[in-house]
Structure formats: C-alpha cells, structure tokens
C-alpha cells in the first residue's frame, strides 16, 4: 500500500540517506598539512612525511557549531544518521562511496568520521505561521560528514566518489537496516571550486512508486580531510521533485574550519 503524504513527511523528517528505510517507525501514516612543509637543505631529497589522519574526536571539534553559520541551526544528527557503513549497502560495490557520502559517512577507507546536521533557521523570520504540515517541513537540512585519512587516502576517497558517479550512472539498489530503495540515476554536476578538490553529483531516487526526487551531494577535500554535504528539503521530498542545491554558506563555513 502506498503511504500518504503525511506518512511520507513523517519519514522524511528523520532520514539522512537516500532511503526511507532508516525510518520504519513512521511508516504506518587536523593534522598538519605536511605537503606544504619545507625540508631542510640537508634532506631536500627525502620524501615528505606521510600525512596523518585526524582522530574522530579531532574531527568532531572541526564540525560546524551553533552560531557559526548565520541563519542555520546545528544539531548532532545522531537520531537520523546511520551509525556505520555496515548499515548502508548497495548492490554495486562501486556505488558504495556515493551511498556513504549521502549518509555523512566516510567515502574512503578510514575509521575517522564525524557528522552532524545543519538546517535552515526560520524561527526568527517575521513570516506567517505554516498553513499546513508540508509548509512546516519546508526547510533545507544538510547532513555534513567529515573523514580524515593517512597518506594519500583522501585523494583515493575522492577518486572513489568520482569513479562511482560514472559507474553508477544507471542507478543502483540501496539497502539500510533491511529496507530497500532504488537510486535510478546518478550524474556529475559542476561543483563550486572549494578546498583542494571538489566532486558534486545528483541522484534520482524512486519515491516508492510515486515518482522520483532529485538530491544533490557535494564532496570536498581539504588536505587529508574530506567533507561530504547532502541536502534534503522535507516538503519537496514528500511531493517528489528536486531538492535545492547544497547551501554555499554551509560549505564555505565548514571548509573554512578544516586544517
């Protein structure tokens, strides 16, 4: 049976990946940048020391905090985001980095990962009260993930995302906590030049037989840290259609905090 718009709104209010499956409860209605360091003249020919990965605790300190982005609220996102990569699986290994990026998980090979959620703050705006449930959910929420890598791991993570966009152009199946959904199309997008490297892509997701919705993801590398951004508009998601782009203000503020 197809769920009503109200039920789907209930679901979208608590998801952070390209799937309804994380919300079954509602279904019934720093390290230093060594690449820039200079070797002494006596060791000019020696290879630069490999970059060290930041710890999860260090990454958590680099996440955006309340008050650092005007017009936005910051929350932990712990109640909506999957706790580990084992919770998010695809039917094509090449597509795993894309699914992880949309879930604020590390797209590459590392255990150092931290995440939160940054949403529009409309409470201070002098506007009329929402007229219906959909209007109340008409906010953009961006799930932000930070991951850190040793050596050239960050570059490899970015390549995995870029390669995945091409390999998964025809879509892929996604499963979370035993529930499945379908990404029907993936396409590269022109992302703003941020950090040292940026990969952006759009994903069309089947809305349980009620059309598709298009989501946008941006992945930015700065040094050996990778930041992922995935934006959901709850009202738009309930209707099907296209989500807004990842807010530039959120990307700019987060990348500025990275070492």
Locate each region found by the language model:
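C-terminal motif of bacterial Sec signal peptides marking the signal peptidase cleavage site
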Residues: 21-25
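A short, solvent-exposed beta-edge/loop patch
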Residues: 185-248
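A small/polar (G/S/T-enriched), proline-flanked helix-loop surface module common
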Residues: 74-213
């Amino acid at each position: 049976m197809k769920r009503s718009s109200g039920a789907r709104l209930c679901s979208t209010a608590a998801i952070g990946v390209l799937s309804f499956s994380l919300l079954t409860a509602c279904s019934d209605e720093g390290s230093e940048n060594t690449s820039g360091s200079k070797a002494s003249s006596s060791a000019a020919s020696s290879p630069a020391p490999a970059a060290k990965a930041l710890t999860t605790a260090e990454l958590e300190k680099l996440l955006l905090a309340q008050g650092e982005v005007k017009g936005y609220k910051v929350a932990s996102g712990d109640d909506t985001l999957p706790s580990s990569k084992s919770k998010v699986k695809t039917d094509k290994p090449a597509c795993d980095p894309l699914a992880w990026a949309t879930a604020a998980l590390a797209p590459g090979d590392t255990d150092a990962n931290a995440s939160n959620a940054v949403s529009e703050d409309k409470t201070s705006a002098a506007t009329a009260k929402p007229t219906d449930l959909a209007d109340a959910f008409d906010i953009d929420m961006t799930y932000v993930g930070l991951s850190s890598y040793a050596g050239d791991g960050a570059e490899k993570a970015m390549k995995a995302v870029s390669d995945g966009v091409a390999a998964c152009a025809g879509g892929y199946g996604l499963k979370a906590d035993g529930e499945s959904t379908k990404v029907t199309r993936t396409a590269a997008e022109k992302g703003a030049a941020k950090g040292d490297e940026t990969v952006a892509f759009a994903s069309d997701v089947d809305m349980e037989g009620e059309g598709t919705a298009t989501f946008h993801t941006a992945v930015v590398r700065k040094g050996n840290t990778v930041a992922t951004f995935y934006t959901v508009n709850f009202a738009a998601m309930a209707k099907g259609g296209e989500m807004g782009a990842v807010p530039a203000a959120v990307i700019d503020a987060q990348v500025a905090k990275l070492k």
